[in-house]
Amino acid sequence: MKARIILIICLITGIAAHLSANEKIYINREVTTHIVMPENIKMVDISTTKIIGNQCTDNIVRIKPYLENDSISSEGYKENELLGTLTIIGERHIAQYDILYTESPKYASTIYNVSYNETQSYI
C-alpha cells in the first residue's frame, strides 16, 4: 500500500513538473528578439520589469532585457538568469515562455517563431 501511495505521488509530481515547464527564449542586451505568433495577438504580459518590449505588428512582439543605463556592464544579469515569464495570448491560443539572459549575443534569439505545438488552445 505504501509503495502505491509513493508511486502515485511521484507520478503526480512528474506530471505537474512537466505541465509547468515553459519553453525558453534567450535574450541579450545587444540583440532585439522578435517573437512571431502564428495568429494575431490579443494581449502580451511581461511578468517583470527586467524585460521591456512592445507589440510591433499584429502577430509580432519584440523584447530586450531592461538595463537602467546602457553603460551598465552585462554583469547586471548573470548567464542563464531567469528574467521573467512572457505570456502571449493570441486569437485562439496562448503561449508562455521563460526568458533567460545570455551574455553572448550569438546565443540570443533574433527571431523566434512560435509553433502551434508550443501553444495551448483556450477556446
Identify the residue ranges that each predicted region occupies.
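Glycine- and charge-rich intrinsically disordered segments
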Residues: 1
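Sec-dependent N-terminal signal peptides
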Residues: 4-14
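A general "mature secreted/periplasmic domain" signal
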Residues: 19-123
